[in-house]
């Protein structure tokens, strides 16, 4: 019985933690999902963005008290403008997606929303990209990856 309880907690912690991508694994996944060069944004820039936004973690969240909104998932997509979490006041839901879907291990919906955001606002919609990736050599983010 004790072993079952421990096993249950182990599975629960994996479910809560989500998937933390290895850098090259994420590069291959983003390329497969069509982000390499999408709207002129290189794969290396997407890797830099996701590293600084979420450390490649699909379950990452960050609450923003000033806007009473939350950023979700590997791209840290905001509930005020892009997804519906059912609790953010005056949310727009521009991607027409539940915020919880942006935290799935299968990141196809998160990528689709990121494509929508970059189509409307460009890569500068992400503060982490402006702070850590813009005007930097980001080639190291894809270096050594078999793409």
Curated annotation (Swiss-Prot):
Explain the purpose of this protein.
Lysozymes have primarily a bacteriolytic function; those in tissues and body fluids are associated with the monocyte-macrophage system and enhance the activity of immunoagents.
The UniProt entry annotates the active site at 53, 71
The primary gene name is LYZ2
What Gene Ontology terms for biological process does this UniProt record contain?
A: defense response to Gram-negative bacterium; defense response to Gram-positive bacterium; digestion; killing of cells of another organism
Q: What else is known?
A: Lysozyme C is capable of both hydrolysis and transglycosylation; it also shows a slight esterase activity. It acts rapidly on both peptide-substituted and unsubstituted peptidoglycan, and slowly on chitin oligosaccharides.
Q: How does it assemble?
A: Monomer.
* Pfam families (UniProt xref): Lys
Concerning CDD domains, the annotation shows:
LYZ_C
Q: Which GO terms describe its molecular function?
A: lysozyme activity
- Which positions make up the signal peptide? 1-18
Keywords of the record, alphabetical order, are: Antimicrobial, Bacteriolytic enzyme, Digestion, Disulfide bond, Glycosidase, Hydrolase, Signal
The similarity comment for this entry is:
Belongs to the glycosyl hydrolase 22 family.
User: Where in the chain are disulfide-linked cysteines found?
Assistant: 24-145, 48-133, 83-99, 95-113
Task: Write the Enzyme Commission number(s) for this entry.
Answer: 3.2.1.17
> Where does the entry say this protein is expressed, by tissue?
Stomach-specific.
Name of this chain's protein: Lysozyme C-2
**Organism whose genome encodes this protein:** Bos taurus (Bovine)
Say if the entry is tagged with keyword Metal-binding. no
Which reaction(s) does the protein catalyse, per the Swiss-Prot or TrEMBL entry? Answer: Hydrolysis of (1->4)-beta-linkages between N-acetylmuramic acid and N-acetyl-D-glucosamine residues in a peptidoglycan and between N-acetyl-D-glucosamine residues in chitodextrins
């Amino acid at each position: 019985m004790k072993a079952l309880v421990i096993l249950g907690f182990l599975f629960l912690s994996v479910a809560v933690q989500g998937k933390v991508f290895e850098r090259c694994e994420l590069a291959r996944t983003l390329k497969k999902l069509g982000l390499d060069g999408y709207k002129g944004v290189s794969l290396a820039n997407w890797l830099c963005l996701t590293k600084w936004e979420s450390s490649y973690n699909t379950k990452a969240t960050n609450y923003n008290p000033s806007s009473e909104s939350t950023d979700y998932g590997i791209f840290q997509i905001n509930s005020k403008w892009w997804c519906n979490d059912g609790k953010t006041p005056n949310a727009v839901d521009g991607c027409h997606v539940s915020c919880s879907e942006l935290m799935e291990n299968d990141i196809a919906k998160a990528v689709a929303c990121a494509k929508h955001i970059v189509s409307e606002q460009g890569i500068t919609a992400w503060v982490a990209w402006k702070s850590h990736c813009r005007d930097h050599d980001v080639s190291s983010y894809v270096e050594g990856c078999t793409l």
